[in-house]
Amino acid sequence: MLKKILFTILCFCSLTLTAQQPDSLSIKNGIDNPSILSTHHFGIFSSRLNTNFKYAPPQKTTFAFNYTSGNNFQPFVEAYYPKNHEIRKQLSQVKWHNRRFNFIDQETTPADYLNIVIDAVIKEFRATVNIPINKQHELGITLRSYLITKGKYPFSIFTSDEGIEWFHSNAVGGEDPFGRRYYGLNQVNFRYFDRNGNTLQLNNNDFFIGGLEFNHYYYPKLSLNTTQNIYLNFGTHLGLNTSKYNSSIDVGISANAIKKLTLKNNHELNLAVGANLLRKNIINFKEVIDLGNNPYLASLEGEIEITKYTKKGNYNAFGINYHIQSRYNKKAEGEYYRLIGKWQEINGGWQNGVYTLYEPLSSWNIIYTYGTPKYLLTLFIKEDLEVNNAPDFQTGVSLKIPISK
């Protein structure tokens, strides 16, 4: 499996680095984050959009490799969606956990049905090339891939089941708050049966190529750039999803704004906000798994970053980032679905596999970057304070280097 991963990465790198020589980065181009997208078990199959908080295109072509690890855990849960409008109306008047619907058969009690269970540590590998077309246009090309694991030491120190449950037991949450110990630690149980009768199943050490993404950014020249130190950019996005479960094309648009403040003692403050809109599955090449019946994914992101420059001209930057994404499924269905799970055996979150598909997903990210003219090294952690556990906790590291034209 490791050989497959290395072969994929080396093939992409060889295509991008051929005839290239090391060069220098133009140091500190806005907030230059790596991909901080979550390892959500639906999201990994689509070409979700990262936010771009740079001031301008890079002066040189850059290559970045990004690795992230996220612990996803949602116990087995079943969902029924009655087709009878009168039954829907009755259920909508009852809180979701008190609803009663006894399915007999499709003729007597017609209803859609699905079930899902997610228990895995998902590893994401991204290789990205950013090419400056000119001083106002940039093209980014990304290859993303995934590895499904049990999350054992030493490869998942912070995102393993043991690490998370130790934190719950000794710091916050209490003993086994979501049922990880009840179901068993360090295992993979990744299965989704959709309402169309299709099954998505992944096993330990399964590796797949998620897709290829093309991102174009336009950086307009405005008087605000010099008078107010405010920078804007606009993106258009095309994603080719290549997994067997979602062979499709996504398209999207984005808009971002960054404010730069120069402070005393070699400090700099950047404030940024961005918005993205993705149209999933605008083209399907074959029948795909139902990864949410909401065709659009919208996201908002904001960040505050403080930078300290060293005497040698390098820098240390700390950022706090908030990200929120729209729900995967249409909100109206959440008014009448019937959920079935082990609510008596599990302390909390037994419903999350379906319930959270009807809720916006948010996360806080803490990002540290060390920048030099030769490379950018970034570390980040992602925490889901809403405890949707998709993922519960995520860590990542990225290395970016310049390559000449």
How does the language model describe each region?
Residues 59-67, 137-141, 228-236, 251, ...:
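Transmembrane beta-strands of outer-membrane beta-barrel proteins
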Residues 67-73, 143-149, 218-220, 236-242, ...:
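Transmembrane beta-strands of outer-membrane beta-barrel pores
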Residues 139-295, 302, 333-353:
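Outer-membrane pore/translocation modules
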Residues 21-25, 47-61, 130-138, 221-230, ...:
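Short loop/turn motifs that connect adjacent beta-strands in outer-membrane beta-barrel proteins
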Residues 170-194, 284-405:
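Outer membrane beta-barrel transmembrane domains
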Residues 21-198, 326-350:
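A subset of solvent-exposed loop/turn segments in beta-rich extracellular surface proteins, enriched
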Residues 45, 59-61, 119-125, 147, ...:
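Residues that define the transmembrane beta-barrel architecture of outer-membrane proteins
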Residues 49-51, 125-131, 212-220, 238, ...:
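Residues on the lipid-exposed face of transmembrane beta-strands in outer-membrane beta-barrel proteins
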